[in-house]
């Protein structure tokens, strides 16, 4: 088994949640009917629907240690997705690092020293 632990940085709960949020945030569009149609097309073309791509379900099943990192100013993958993911992790060790005032994928840039320390500490346990 090659994977010892996971460092999850600005992760989303599901493809559906992320795409629906982006439709609303970026374009002011409701999820219906576009999400339903796009999910159906994805099923026809690639063999999977948006309902099947639920990262939160993978987190629920994971037994490997997981460090969750998220910027509290992230609007691309909303900060509100962090807590459900963290709470879904029921098996194995887990930890959380909230990067204050960091936007999407900027936790490392904004908090380089603390980010590095948290990751080293978590991986070293």
Where are these regions (language model features)?
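Hydrophobic/aromatic anchor residues within beta-strands of the central parallel beta-sheet
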Residues: 6, 96-97
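Hydrolase active-site cap/lid region
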Residues: 1-48
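Short alpha-helix in the alpha/beta-hydrolase fold that links the catalytic acid
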Residues: 55, 64, 78-87
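Catalytic histidine-centered segment of alpha/beta-hydrolase-like enzymes
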Residues: 102-116
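Acidic catalytic loop of the alpha/beta-hydrolase fold
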Residues: 72-77, 105-106
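Active-site nucleophile elbow and catalytic-triad environment of alpha/beta-hydrolase enzymes
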Residues: 41-58, 64
């Amino acid at each position: 088994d090659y994977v010892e632990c996971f460092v999850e940085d600005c992760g989303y709960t599901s493809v559906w949640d992320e795409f629906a949020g982006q439709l609303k945030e970026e374009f002011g569009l409701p999820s219906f009917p576009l999400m339903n149609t796009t999910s159906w097309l994805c099923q026809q073309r690639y063999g999977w629907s948006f309902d099947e791509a639920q990262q939160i379900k993978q987190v629920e099943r994971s037994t490997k240690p997981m460090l969750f990192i998220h910027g509290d100013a992230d609007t691309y993958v909303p900060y509100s997705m962090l807590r459900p993911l963290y709470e879904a992790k029921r098996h194995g060790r887990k930890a959380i690092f909230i990067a204050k005032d960091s936007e999407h994928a900027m936790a490392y840039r904004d908090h380089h020293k603390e980010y590095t320390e948290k990751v080293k500490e978590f991986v070293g346990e």
